C-alpha cells in the first residue's frame, strides 16, 4: 500500500509541475504540451536500460545448471518408462 501512495504522490507532483509550466508560460506552450510524451519515452528508455543492465549482470550458477541437467535426465527417464519418445539426447 505504501508503494502505491508513493507512486500516486509522484504522479500528482509531476502533474502539478506540468500544469504550473502550462500556466506560467516559462517554456513555450508548444514545448510544454509535449512534456508528458517526453516523460513516457524517457521512462521507457530507463526501463530498457535497467533490463539491459540486469541482463549484463545476470549471475551464472553452475550448481543450478548441474541440478537442472539432473532434473532433465530424471524427467526423460520418467517419460521413457511411461512410453513417451523423448528423443535421442
UniProtKB/Swiss-Prot annotation:
Location in or out of the cell: Endoplasmic reticulum membrane
Membrane topology reported for the UniProt record: Multi-pass membrane protein
Cellular compartments per GO CC: dolichol-phosphate-mannose synthase complex; endoplasmic reticulum; endoplasmic reticulum membrane
Major subcellular site: endoplasmic reticulum
Gene Ontology biological-process annotations: protein glycosylation
Family in the record: Belongs to the DPM3 family.
Record function comment: Regulates the biosynthesis of dolichol phosphate-mannose. Regulatory subunit of the dolichol-phosphate mannose (DPM) synthase complex; essential for the ER localization and stable expression of DPMS1.
Protein name according to UniProt: Dolichol-phosphate mannose synthase subunit 3
Amino acid at each position: 500500500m505504501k508503494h502505491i501512495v508513493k507512486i500516486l504522490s509522484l504522479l500528482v507532483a509531476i502533474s502539478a509541475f506540468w500544469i504550473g509550466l502550462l500556466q506560467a508560460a516559462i517554456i513555450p506552450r508548444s514545448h510544454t504540451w509535449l512534456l508528458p510524451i517526453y516523460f513516457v519515452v524517457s521512462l521507457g528508455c530507463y526501463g530498457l536500460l535497467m533490463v539491459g543492465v540486469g541482463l549484463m549482470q545476470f549471475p551464472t550458477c553452475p550448481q543450478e545448471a548441474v541440478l537442472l541437467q539432473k532434473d532433465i535426465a530424471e524427467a526423460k527417464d520418467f517419460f521413457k518408462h511411461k512410453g513417451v519418445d523423448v528423443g535421442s539426447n
